[in-house]
Amino acid sequence: MRTILISGSSRGIGLNIAHKELKEGNRISVGIRNLESLKGSVIDPNKWPEGRIIINHYDALRKITAENWIKNTVDEFGGFDSVINCSGVLSKVPFLYKDGDEEDILNTLNINFLAIWHLCRLSWDHLCTSGRGRIIVLVSMSGKRSKGDLAAYSSSKFALM
């Protein structure tokens, strides 16, 4: 059994990965912005035996929430051996962006790149202690082939490759 931190698991690929890991018998600690978003979902903690899933508030733009998430996971599960990074944002900022788009570009880079780097760095000692640590980062083909209006998104995904 693995114990896995999964970011961005309230919908989409992250939700499906979290569900798959639970079905395979693993314990998961999910980090999401909206704690209520899992009610009624396939990973609603009320649908699983106690001790299989914990829900943590995680805002990729606030490093303290990553620190708290890791601490809560270690306190509850005794540690973890995997981190799966699924959180991210899609922003439509073209390569020839307009003045004023810099904030959107920085937000995209902070969430899609720096937050993942921070979470992995904060997790590193725990992953090493487990003796079988794994880091999985979801990227996108857009990181290799940029479309005109996805320059910020593509740059943030390329930075992860």
Residue spans of the language-model regions?
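A short helix-coil junction within the Rossmann-fold of NAD(P)-dependent oxidoreductases
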Residues: 24, 76-77, 94, 122-131
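Conserved glycine-rich Rossmann-like NAD(P)H-binding loop of the short-chain dehydrogenase/reductase
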Residues: 24-41
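Active-site helix of classical SDR
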Residues: 120, 156
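Rossmann-fold cofactor-recognition segment
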Residues: 48-62
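Conserved mid-core segment of classical short-chain dehydrogenase/reductases
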Residues: 90-106, 149-152
